[in-house]
UniProtKB/Swiss-Prot annotation:
One of its GO terms (biological process) is phosphatidylserine biosynthetic process. Pfam families: PSS. It catalyses: a 1,2-diacyl-sn-glycero-3-phosphoethanolamine + L-serine = a 1,2-diacyl-sn-glycero-3-phospho-L-serine + ethanolamine; a 1,2-diacyl-sn-glycero-3-phosphocholine + L-serine = a 1,2-diacyl-sn-glycero-3-phospho-L-serine + choline. Its main location: endoplasmic reticulum. Its EC number is 2.7.8.29. It comes from Xenopus tropicalis (Western clawed frog). Pathway: Phospholipid metabolism; phosphatidylserine biosynthesis. It is an enzyme of class 2 (transferase). GO terms for molecular function: L-serine-phosphatidylcholine phosphatidyltransferase activity; L-serine-phosphatidylethanolamine phosphatidyltransferase activity. Catalyzes a base-exchange reaction in which the polar head group of phosphatidylethanolamine (PE) or phosphatidylcholine (PC) is replaced by L-serine. Catalyzes mainly the conversion of phosphatidylcholine but also converts, in vitro and to a lesser extent, phosphatidylethanolamine. The lineage of its organism: Eukaryota, Metazoa, Chordata, Craniata, Vertebrata. PANTHER family: PHOSPHATIDYLINOSITOL SYNTHASE (PTHR15362), PHOSPHATIDYLSERINE SYNTHASE 1 (PTHR15362:SF15). This is Phosphatidylserine synthase 1. It is a multi-pass membrane protein.
């Protein structure tokens, strides 16, 4: 009996582990400004969804088979998202509302299940699904069939250079700005950028559109588009790191302008921490973890090009850019959870969103290999091994350079994320809000304090009045 009671008693390490994992898998809202948006409304939601389903089920026309299937699929997605809000974890983020990130996780689970479903179809059935979604895809052609790449690279003119600044160059720039906001490291961003250009060289024999002139690859892609996006993203990161996060409640704001500003700022991060992927005290496991991060990142990028090449749709088609947008959204909590798993010694397993993202990346690759056997039969295994080896070497050099920079180029002022090589601490909240300690107000100083209250520092654009 005593042994059974002991087995049910959690040790201090188990309690700390559960708390650390909950911080990255189900972050709680600590500063609730409007109680209505954070109170459970399960009975109301159940009543609304049930009545709505009954109404549409008995009142809509059901003569069209295609319309019935489409409306049924949308209803399944809608109710799955409702269940996601009720049952799934928040993830590491709480802004603008935890329910949004629960639905994001729900959409990632749906996409994961859809990829599993695709594995049990044949090529004709997959194309039938695509043609049902968009009949115009029957007449789609591959970009590599109508365009030439890496032709007359010795001809360098201003007109030719300016012709490359199209919508895709704009997408490269803003895409790398968002990647920098997610990764928050110059070293890793530049490493991924250079590694991707090498990835294009190693897989150029499979995808002809990877062939580029040297000046297009080095100057336009790496230096201008990627480099400019990285610089912009990191400047925003540094700005967010230096801000003071002291959120005012709606109840304490008495002006209309202040309430509007506070409502808009609800869509900004609740806090921002300085990220350090590697330091001199890191172990070999950290190096292997960063290498795995690089491989999955490159694999996700490769899936984008292989999917549109194998299933034949243009880069401008909604199937392409909607997937890119969706992957970008679920990457945010994934990187946050993976960084915590990699750097926090008390976090012993990855978060659920990170797990699903990894499964999606490998499932997409599996789908590409199954339905693109004719394409992958031309693969040179030597190039694949050289690619893996090159990524390993570049990753090691990147991490070594980051350690050298930390040792010889000056240490940054220690922040919460650097202390004890841990992202989290049991004694300090995750968001690390520094609130000034207010001295007790004397009786004869009350009037002067109230007069000078409006002259204090305004944080996050909202002042208390």
């Amino acid at each position: 009996m005593v042994s059974a009671m002991r087995s049910r008693t959690l040790s201090k390490d188990d309690v700390n582990y559960k708390m650390h994992f909950r911080m990255i898998n189900e972050q709680q809202v600590e500063d609730i400004t409007i109680d209505f948006f954070y109170k459970p409304h399960t009975i109301t939601l159940l009543t609304f969804t049930t009545v709505s389903l009954m109404y549409f089920a008995f009142t809509r026309e059901n003569t069209s088979q295609e319309d019935n299937i489409w409306k049924g699929i949308l209803s399944v997605i809608f109710f799955f998202l409702i269940i996601s809000v009720l049952a799934f974890p928040n993830g590491p983020f709480t802004r603008p509302h935890p329910a949004i990130w629960r639905m994001v996780f729900g959409l990632s689970v749906l996409y994961f299940l859809f990829l599993v479903f695709l594995l049990f179809l044949n090529v004709e059935q997959v194309k039938a699904v695509m043609y049902w979604l968009d009949p115009n895809l029957r007449y789609a052609t591959r970009e590599s069939d109508v365009m030439e790449y890496a032709v007359n690279c010795h001809v360098i003119t201003w007109e030719r250079i300016l012709s490359h600044f199209d919508i895709f160059a704009f997408g490269h720039f803003w895409g790398w700005a968002m990647k920098a906001l997610l990764i928050r490291s110059y070293g890793l961003c530049w490493t991924i950028s250079i590694t991707w250009e090498m990835t294009e060289l190693f897989f150029m024999h499979l995808l002809p559109n990877f062939a580029e002139c040297w000046w297009d690859q080095v100057i336009l892609d790496i230096l201008l588009c990627n480099g400019g996006g990285i610089l912009l993203g990191m400047v925003v990161c540094r700005f967010l790191e230096m801000r003071t996060y002291h959120w005012a409640s709606f109840k304490d704001i008495h002006t209309t302008t202040g309430k509007i500003k506070r409502a808009v700022l609800q869509f900004t991060p609740a806090s921002w921490i300085y990220v350090r992927w590697f330091d001199p005290k890191s172990s070999f496991q950290r190096v292997a973890g960063v290498y795995l991060f690089m491989i999955i990142w490159q694999l996700t990028e490769l899936n984008t090009f292989f999917l549109k090449h194998i299933f034949v749709f243009q880069a401008s088609h909604p199937l392409s850019w909607c997937r890119i947008l969706f992957i970008g959204i679920i990457t945010a909590p994934t990187v946050r959870q993976y960084y915590a798993y990699l750097t926090d010694t008390q976090c012993k397993r990855v978060g659920t969103q990170c797990w699903v993202f990894g499964a999606i990346a490998f499932l997409e690759a599996t789908v590409c290999i199954k339905f693109g056997q004719d394409l992958f039969s031309k693969t040179h295994l030597l190039y694949v091994f050289l690619w893996l080896f090159s990524v390993a070497v570049i990753t090691f050099l990147c991490l070594y350079g980051m350690v050298w920079y930390a040792d010889y180029c000056g240490q940054r002022e220690k922040t919460f994320s650097e202390c004890e090589d841990s992202t989290y601490n049991t004694d300090i909240p995750w968001h690390h809000i520094d609130k000034p300690v207010e001295a007790p107000v004397k009786q004869n100083e009350g009037t002067s304090r109230r007069k000078n209250r409006h002259k204090g520092k305004v944080t996050n654009g909202v002042g208390k009045k």
